[in-house]
């Protein structure tokens, strides 16, 4: 319960040549895969770690990665360098707790 796994597809990193934005569906599929691998190795305890997503999220799509993509949090990169955008991400994600 104290372990957090960050998933960031290399092809979704904005500085990567051939960069391609990931979708919440991409995230969901990989999070399911990660959970299956963990379950094979560790059994029922595999459901305990939180899995967060970190592939070029922004204020427009961050909420979708949590709501539809299976992520339990975000590892915000470039968007965190702009305070207004970062605050927008936080406020949108807070709506899930209401």
Residue ranges and their predicted role:
Residues 1-46:
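Active-site rim beta-loop-alpha module in soluble metabolic enzymes
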Residues 3-9, 47-55, 72-76:
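Hydrophobic faces of well-ordered beta-strands that scaffold small-molecule active sites
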Residues 16-17, 56, 70-89:
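Glycine-rich phosphate-binding active-site loops on the catalytic face of alpha/beta enzymes
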Residues 24-27, 80-98:
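C-terminal helical cap(s) of enzyme catalytic domains, especially alpha/beta-barrels
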Residues 28-35, 62, 87-90:
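Generic structural signal for well-ordered alpha-helices
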Residues 37-41, 64, 92:
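A generic secondary-structure signal
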Residues 66-68:
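Acidic (Asp/Glu)-rich catalytic clusters
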């Amino acid at each position: 319960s104290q372990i957090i796994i960050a998933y960031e597809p290399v092809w979704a990193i904005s500085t990567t040549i051939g960069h391609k934005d990931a979708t919440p569906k991409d995230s969901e599929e990989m999070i399911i895969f990660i959970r299956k691998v963990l379950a094979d190795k560790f059994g029922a305890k595999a459901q305990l770690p939180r899995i967060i997503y970190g592939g070029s999220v922004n204020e427009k799509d961050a909420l979708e990665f949590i709501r539809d993509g299976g992520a339990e949090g975000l590892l915000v990169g470039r968007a965190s360098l702009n305070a207004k955008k970062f605050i927008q991400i936080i406020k949108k994600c807070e709506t899930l707790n209401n």
